[in-house]
Structure formats: C-alpha cells, structure tokens
C-alpha cells in the first residue's frame, strides 16, 4: 500500500528514458529497503532499473533465476494521490468507492471479485487507479526477498531481482543490461488471477499505411482533388465488421486494429497493430490489409499509398518450448502453494516476451491484480500472499532439482 501511494505513471508521449523521472522515486525506495534486508548489491542505474541479488545458500550448482516486475503504472487513469483502501472480509457484494460514489466495482461485472468473498480486498478510493499493475508484483517480490533473507533454512541458488520502468509504454526492457543481470531463467510477476501461469503471448507487428492524395483549391477542385483523408476512411471502413478486430475476437483469434489516423488532403497516415498467436499468421493479416488498400486505391485515379510493416514482439512460446522446465517448475511451485495452476495465454505483450528473445526465457506468474488501468482496479491480499509463497517455493524447486 505504501508503494501504491507513490505516483509512478509512465508517459507514452515522452522520448526520455525513463519517460518520467518520478518512477525513480519508488525505485530509490526499493533499493533502500533491499539494502536494509542485507542485499548489499542492490542498485538503481541511470536508466531507472533496479538490480539486486539474493545470494545462494546451497553448495549445489543451481541455475540463476530472476524475478521481475515493473514500477510504472498506466496513464489510462490518474495515478496522482492514490489512496489505497482495504475492504476487510469482503462480503461478496458491490464495492462503492468513497471519493466518487459513482465508481462502483460491481460483483456482477467482475465475477472474479465475487469469488473472493471473505478475502481482504485492496482498491483505490474512486478518483485514481490503484496501481496493482504492477506494484502488487513489486510488493510480492520484496516480501519474498525478505522471507528468503531471514530464513536461511530455505535452500536456494542465487536469485536476481529486476525492477523495470516504462513497461506500460512498451519500453520496459529496452535498456536492460543482460550481462549485469546474469540470470539463466526468469519470471515476470505481472499476471492476474490466482494460479495463472502464462507462457504464451501474441506475436505483434505494427503497420502504417500512408495515403498520398492530390490537393487543389476547393473552389476549383472538380475532377482534380483526390482526398487522402477520404481514402484512408474508406480503407478503415473496408475492414471486416464481424471478425479480425479486438471487439469481435477472443481466445486465440488474431486481429487487425487501426489505432491512429492523422493527416491532410495530400497525405494521411493510418497506424495499425496486428496481432496473432501464430507468428506465421501475421504475414497473412498483412497481405489481407494490403489487398484492401490496393482495392480502395484502384477507385481513386492519381492517388498512391504505401504499406510499411514493423516487427514489435514475438510469442515467448517460441523460446519457452525449448526450456520446458522453466514453466514446469513454476507450475510445481504454484501447486506447493496450495493452488491449481491455470495455464493461460496473454492477448497482449509482456516484458517476459522481450526478455525471452533477449536470452532469458521468462513466463508470467499471477499477482492477483485485476481490472487493470482503471479506477475499478483491485487485488486480494490473500492472492498476493499465495504469490509470495509461489516465489519462495519456486526458489526451492530449482534448488531441489539441481
């Protein structure tokens, strides 16, 4: 709850790194608290990353594992003046937030919340997000670190801790020093419901269609003017209405999603995000988009257009399939915590995906964070306690199997 009160929102419009200096306010506190635990090498680097090591206490040669969470919170809702509230022994009904009583966390709209009857639920007060994404993960790693440092009877290998900035703007591991991190395998603590274990995520590309029209004075434009704006609108309108969009897909279905249109009569840009669990399907989606573009363009004499595709990230399953023990050990740790593992796929990206392709195979483990990026955000304290237990058991599992 202390961490939640520190404003650490990242800024998607910033070109600095980290995108906001205030993220370091929490990072500096984490370094101080890690050092107070006896983790003497805890440090904050110039880019806003926290690195720390829990030393091994076993003679076995155990792979070095890393636990990672991000300190920044989303810019989708205010993160200033967060006032966390504990709703003790939640009664299973709606939660009305006191600072804005129009903000109600409905048990009907949030069935997972309804299943947490009897738990202690943390929310914000109604005017901000909570920031459990991912301060729940940060707190869980810190609690587990404190436990391991004070319980030498729990045997484990060297454990690396990594706290990152700017995950919410897609730049979370952009400047991670992998040599300094020096870990063999990793786990992001950034998942949702109790027991969830995510070892697969979307593969992602970005695409930009640039339409070039012909400008003319509106008063004498007949048979001359060709509007790039209108052509761009036709391209977007030609996308399927009942498929291939975020609002019409779920489970393992991919999509083509226009996220920005900007321009003039002479030149208009349309930005798309293209997603699918199968990397090979991205090319098919991009070919489909090109056909739409060409078909629309053929109706407008003199107009031109280009399509540029940029790789964004890939499905971490492509890496993790070669290291099955990483996910298997996590599932075993979750079971030891008394929870049934729920294997899930992420309809989005994760720092773990990028880390996996940077040489650190890295699935995602639950934290309890729910209703992310909103004033309705909540987390169960009991779920968080189970996440802490999972981290501790996971350290033990790796040592036992070494």
Residue spans of the language-model regions?
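Metal-dependent amide/peptide-bond hydrolase catalytic core
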Residues: 229-402
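N-terminal capping segment at the start of a domain
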Residues: 1-21, 123, 215, 313, ...
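Midchain, well-structured core segments that form catalytic/ion-binding scaffolds
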Residues: 95, 110, 119-132, 165-287, ...
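A non-catalytic alpha/beta surface segment that caps or lines the substrate-entry region
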Residues: 15-62, 66-68, 72, 83
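Short glycine-aspartate micro-motif
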Residues: 64-68, 184-188, 208, 362-364
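Active-site metal-coordination/substrate-binding segment of hydrolases
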Residues: 60-158, 163, 183
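Short, conserved micro-motifs enriched in small and acidic residues
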Residues: 21, 128-139, 222-230, 378-385
């Amino acid at each position: 709850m202390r961490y939640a009160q520190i404003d650490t929102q990242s800024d998607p419009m910033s070109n600095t790194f980290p995108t906001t200096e205030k993220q370091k306010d929490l990072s500096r506190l984490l370094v101080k608290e890690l050092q107070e635990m006896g983790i003497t090498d805890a440090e904050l680097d110039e880019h806003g990353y926290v690195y720390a090591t829990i030393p091994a206490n076993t003679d076995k040669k155990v792979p070095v594992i890393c636990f990672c969470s991000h300190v920044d919170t989303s810019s989708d809702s205010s993160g200033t003046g967060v006032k966390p509230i504990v709703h003790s022994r939640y009664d299973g009904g709606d939660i009305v937030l006191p600072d804005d009583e129009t903000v109600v966390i409905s048990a009907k709209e949030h069935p997972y919340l309804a299943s947490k009857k009897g738990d202690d639920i943390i929310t914000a007060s109604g005017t901000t997000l909570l920031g459990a994404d991912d301060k729940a993960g940060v707190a869980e790693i810190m609690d587990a670190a404190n436990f391991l440092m004070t319980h030498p009877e729990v045997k484990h290998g060297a454990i690396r801790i990594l706290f990152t900035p700017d995950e919410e703007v897609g730049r979370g591991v952009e400047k991670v020093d992998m040599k300094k991190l020096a870990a063999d395998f990793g786990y992001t603590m950034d998942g949702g419901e109790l027991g969830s274990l995510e070892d697969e995520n979307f593969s992602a590309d970005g695409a930009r269609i640039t339409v070039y029209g012909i400008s003319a004075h509106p008063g004498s434009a007949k048979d001359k003017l060709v509007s790039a704006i209108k052509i761009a609108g036709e391209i977007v309108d030609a996308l399927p209405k009942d498929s291939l969009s975020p609002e019409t897909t779920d489970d393992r279905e991919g999509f083509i999603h226009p996220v920005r249109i900007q321009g003039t009569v002479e030149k208009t840009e349309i930005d798309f995000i293209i997603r699918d669990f199968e990397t090979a399907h991205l090319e098919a989606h991009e070919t489909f988009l090109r056909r739409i573009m060409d078909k629309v363009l053929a109706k407008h004499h003199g107009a031109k257009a280009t399509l540029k595709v940029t790789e964004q990230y890939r499905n971490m399953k492509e890496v993790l399939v070669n290291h099955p023990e990483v996910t298997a050990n996590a599932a075993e740790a979750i079971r030891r915590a008394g929870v049934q593992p729920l294997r899930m796929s992420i309809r989005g990206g994760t720092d773990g995906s990028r880390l996996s392709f940077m040489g650190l195979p890295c699935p995602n483990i639950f934290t309890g964070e729910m209703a992310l990026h909103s004033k309705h955000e909540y987390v169960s304290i009991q779920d968080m306690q189970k996440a802490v237990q999972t981290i501790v058991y996971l350290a033990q599992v790796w040592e036992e199997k070494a």
